[in-house]
Amino acid sequence: MAERKKTLVLGASPNPVRFSHKAVKSLLRHDQEVVAVGFREGLIVEEEILTGHPPIEDVHTVSIYIGSSRQTDYYDYIFSLKPERVIFNPGTVNPEFMGRLKQAGIEPVSECMLVMLNDGEY
């Protein structure tokens, strides 16, 4: 079994066709601890979608599912979580933020989290 890594999915949606929704379900299937943060409250399986900037401890990975134009509102929040890495899923790549993360010693990853999970590279 892979090491458990608490992952915060940023941009989580209760809509089952959204990739953020699929990501939360996939993390749960892979026995990973997940925190879903989105713009609207809701549920993904049994996981509650939190809103705003909830204080969460021991976050290993932040997986981003929001476009770069909306990410600026979350810069300070993501830094406050002190993750080891931030995954920029397709359509979310933000070179400016990736550079800032790297300077802070946080690994920016430009990959699809779903593929990483399925390939055992998570």
Give residue ranges: language-model regions.
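Structural/interface elements that position substrates and couple domains in central-metabolism enzymes
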Residues: 1-60, 72-89, 93-122
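Cofactor-cradling patches in redox/metallo enzymes
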Residues: 64-70
